[in-house]
Amino acid sequence: MAGELIYAFRVMRLSLLDAGGAPIGRLEDVVVVSGRTSSAPRVLGFVANSQRRRIFVNANRVASLDNAGARLKSWDVDFHPFKPKEGERLLKIGVINQKVGDEVVSDVALRLREDGRTPGWEVSKVRLARRNALRRRPTYRLVDWDTVPTLFAPTTEMAAEAARLRDMHPSDVAG
């Protein structure tokens, strides 16, 4: 499954399944955080709607993500309301439909990362749409995430520092 792309717009309509496969909610958004300048933004988790509440589901708690839905590794679910933190970006609200030059972001492709560190999802590609005055349908192109760096750039100096420290080992941060 490494290298296989899954699109955020598709993920945002999937069911949230417990460890037994029973639906407990629906995914609404994908939360990403910027990495260092050379590393792709990684998926921190998902915002789901369950029992009329918007909750956060950490990406590390998701066992599988496929057409059936996002299946959790365990049975327990944290029903505390979701509140975005400094440096986090929601793909549906903060990235999709943003203008990049004369194009608009129509979707974001995610890829499973298995590089020896903690496996997880990361942003791989961005799908851009351009409307032409003479055509009814837009033209699309798929570009690497680093060709549109302003979409995922940290918004504040504190967010940039948090992105730098996020992948470091705790003993390196303390020292």
Predicted regions and their residues:
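Peripheral interaction segments used for macromolecular assembly
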Residues: 1-175
